[in-house]
Amino acid sequence: MTSAPTVSVITISFNDLDGLQRTVKSVRAQRYRGRIEHIVIDGGSGDDVVAYLSGCEPGFAYWQSEPDGGRYDAMNQGIAHASGDLLWFLHSADRFSGPDVVAQAVEALSGKGPVSELWGFGMDRLVGLDRVRGPIPFSLRKFLAGKQVVPHQASFFGSSLVAKIGGYDLDFGIAADQEFILRAALVCEPVTIRCVLCEFDTTGVGSHREPSAVFGDLRRMGDLHRRYPFGGRRISHAYLRGREFYAYNSRFWENVFTRMSK
C-alpha cells in the first residue's frame, strides 16, 4: 500500500489563546491514516501562550512564540519549517468542519498526479454570518474580475508547487493570500471539493474591507502578472472600477436604510 501523504497544518496566532486552543483541538480530532504535522507560529503573545504550547501532549512538529513581521511573514516562516507533501494554512480561531476533512482533501487529489504538485480548495462557513462560500467550479476569469474569492483557509497546496511559486508577497498587503492563490492557479487548475471544509472566523481584518481596497488590489494583481479578466488592461480596469463604484453605492444605501429603520 502506498503511504499516505504527510500534511503540514500551519497555524499563525497572536494574542488569541482561546482561538488557538480551538484550532489545535480541531487539528487533533482529524481521522487521517497518514501523518499530520502541526506547526504553530505565534507572534509573541505572552507567557500564557508559551505555557500552553510547551505543555501540549503530544507536542507540535514545531512551534515558536516571538515577534514577526505580520501574518504573511509568519506564514512564510511556517512554510520554512514544513516537511509535508501538502500544506494547509489554518489560522488561530479557524477550525476544520469535521474530523475527516484532511482525509477528504487527500482523497480528492488521489489519481490526479503527485500530491506535492497540486492544489485545491473546498468551501468554508462564515461563522456568525450563516453563510457558505466557495467558487466551484473555479474560473480564472471570474477570479481576476473579483467575482470569485477562494477561501484560503479551505485551500491546500502541494509542497513542490509552493516551492515553485514562492511564498507570500509581503509587499502585497492583506490580499497577499489571493495573490498567492493566483500564482498557484497560473501553474495548474485547482482540484475542488463541493463541501464545507472549514469554519472561518470572520472577526479578522481581512474580512471587512472597503471596496476601494478590494478592487484596487485586483487591479494591482492583474498588472503584476499581466493577466486581465477581459484581455486588455484598459477595459479590465474600467470594469473593476465600475464594480467598485457599484459596491460602494450599494453599501452606502444599505447603511442609509439601516439607520432609517432604527
From Swiss-Prot:
Its EC number is 2.4.-.-. InterPro entries: Glyco_trans_2-like (IPR001173), Nucleotide-diphossugar_trans (IPR029044). It comes from the Bacteria. SUPFAM superfamilies: Nucleotide-diphospho-sugar transferases (SSF53448). Pfam families: Glycos_transf_2. Keywords: Glycosyltransferase, Transferase. It is an enzyme of class 2 (transferase). GO terms for molecular function: glycosyltransferase activity. PANTHER family: COLANIC ACID BIOSYNTHESIS GLYCOSYL TRANSFERASE WCAE-RELATED, GLYCOSYLTRANSFERASE. Belongs to the glycosyltransferase 2 family. This is Uncharacterized glycosyltransferase MT1564. It comes from Mycobacterium tuberculosis (strain CDC 1551 / Oshkosh). The lineage of its organism: Bacteria, Bacillati, Actinomycetota, Actinomycetes, Mycobacteriales.
